[in-house]
Amino acid sequence: MTTTKQKKNSKIRHLEYYDLQNTLDTLYADSGRGKIFNNLMPLIESEENIRLAYRNIKRNSGSNTSGIDRLTIKDIEKIPEAKFVEIVRKKLQWYKPKAVRRVEIPKPNGKLRPLGIPAIWDRIVQQCILQILEPICEAKFSDRSNGFRPNRSAEHAIAQAYAFMQKSHMHFVVDIDIKGFFDNVNHSKLIKQMWNIGIQDKKLLCVIKEMLKAPIVLPNGDTIYPQKGTPQGGILSPLLSNIVLNELDWWIISQWEKQPAHNVRDHITKTGAIHRGRAYDAFRKSGLKEMHMVRYLSLIHISEP
C-alpha cells in the first residue's frame, strides 16, 4: 500500500504521463534567460497539452458546474478523444468565447463576491493557455509574490512574513489591500506587460484579448461588455493578475531592498563566507525605512522594525 508521503504530486504525474514536463522545464529555463516567445500557439494546440488540459479540468469539482451553455464536463466526456482535440484546436484558431455567467457568492462580512463561470469549452481553452504560460511567467515572478502559483499558497505567504520578522527583528506589519483590483485591470496595460516579459506571440495575445472582452450575463439576465478587469472565476485570471502586479513587486524590492546597496560589493572573508554588512550600512545611510514585502494576490504585507 502506498503511503501519502510516497504518492507523487498528481500535477507532476499528469505532466509526465503526457510527456510535457521537459517542455515546460525548457520554457522556464528559456524565460529565465530572457528568451522572447513569439510562436507559442503550436505548443498550446498540441494534442498532449489539450489532453492534459482536459485531465486538469476534469479533476476540478467545478467542472460539474455549467456555464451559460448549460454544458459540463460530463457532456465533454461523451465526445471521442480525436474529435475533442480537433474541436479545441478550431476554437483556438478562431477564438470567440461565450458569455460568462455571473453568480454572487456570500462573503464572511455579509457582502457578495461576484464570480464568473465561463462555458466549459472556454475553461478548457484557458487551461491549455495556462499550462504553457505558467512556466514562462514563473521565471519572471518575484519570490515575494504568493497566491495561485505553484507551491505559493496563503500558508507560504504567512510563513515568509513570519520568517522576515524573526530574522530581521521586525515588529510591525502594514497590510495593504488593492480595492477592486480584479475589476479594474487595464486590458491594454496587461497586454503590454505580457509583451514586456517576453510573451510576444501576437495570435496568442489576440486570443487573450477576446477572453478579456467576453460578455458577462448578470444574475438578473442583463448583459454587460467589460472594458476592463479580469473576470473572477476564470482559469487564466489569477495568472494575468499576477502579471499585472509583477511590476509592483519588483519596484518595491528595487526601491527598498536593492537600490541603496546596488553599488556596494559584498565582502568575502578569509573563510570564503560572504559578509553583507557593507550593504546593510549603505541601506542605513540611505534614510529609507528597513522593510520587507510579501504579497498574496492583491494583499500586500509590509514588515517594519
Regions found by a protein language model. Give the residues of each.
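Conserved polymerase palm-domain catalytic core
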Residues: F84, L92, A99, K140-R144, ...
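Conserved phosphate-binding loops in nucleotide/dinucleotide-binding enzymes
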Residues: P114-A119
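Nucleotide/phosphate-binding loop and acidic/charged catalytic motifs
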Residues: I129
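Residues forming anionic-ligand binding surfaces in small-molecule and nucleic-acid pockets
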Residues: E104-N109
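Non-catalytic, polymerase-adjacent accessory regions of viral genome-replication enzymes
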Residues: M1-A82
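Amphipathic alpha-helical blocks
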Residues: D75-P97
